[in-house]
């Protein structure tokens, strides 16, 4: 899923955002030791109208989002140089990685729906009670 704001050439913006997302995902998977950062999935790229800046949205499992964001942003310059080698465009955007909480929100919503569907008379407790 690519996010784009630009009205200038929306098709190009969308294609470029998707290509950046695809290429970055491959580079991160092959080239960066992400053991400290958990399992990272790139969920979207939002390009500025002039293509100079890109917000790269990610989700993470198995680690704190702040840890993953710090590691990705620390590697942003190197990732930019790797993208430059792959993309055949004049300006490769600077990268800023931002945690995308959509996955967590989706899980929370699913739990709320399940709880509502169980109803008050289902005999299944909503939350396990703390015995301490």
From Swiss-Prot:
GO biological processes: maturation of SSU-rRNA
Location, primary (coarse class): cytoplasm
Subcellular locations according to the entry: Cytoplasm
Gene3D superfamilies the UniProt entry points to: 3.30.300.20
UniProt similarity note: Belongs to the RbfA family.
Organism, as annotated: Bordetella avium (strain 197N)
Organism lineage string: Bacteria, Pseudomonadati, Pseudomonadota, Betaproteobacteria, Burkholderiales
PANTHER family: RIBOSOME-BINDING FACTOR A, CHLOROPLASTIC-RELATED
GO annotations of cellular component type: cytosol
Encoding gene (name): rbfA
Listed GO MF terms: ribosomal small subunit binding
Cytoplasm recorded as keyword: yes
The protein's name: Ribosome-binding factor A
């Amino acid at each position: 899923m690519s996010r784009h704001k630009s009205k200038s050439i929306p098709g190009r913006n969308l294609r470029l955002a998707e290509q950046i997302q695809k290429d970055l995902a491959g580079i991160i998977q092959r080239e960066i030791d992400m053991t400290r950062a958990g399992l990272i999935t790139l969920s979207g790229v939002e390009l500025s109208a002039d293509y100079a800046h890109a917000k790269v949205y990610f989700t993470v499992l198995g680690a704190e989002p702040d840890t993953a964001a710090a590691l990705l942003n620390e590697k942003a310059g190197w990732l930019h140089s790797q993208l430059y080698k792959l993309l055949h465009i004049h300006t490769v955007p600077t990268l800023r990685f931002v945690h995308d909480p959509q996955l967590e929100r989706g899980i929370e919503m699913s739990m709320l729906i399940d709880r509502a569907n169980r109803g008050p008379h289902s005999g299944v407790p909503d939350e396990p009670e703390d015995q301490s």
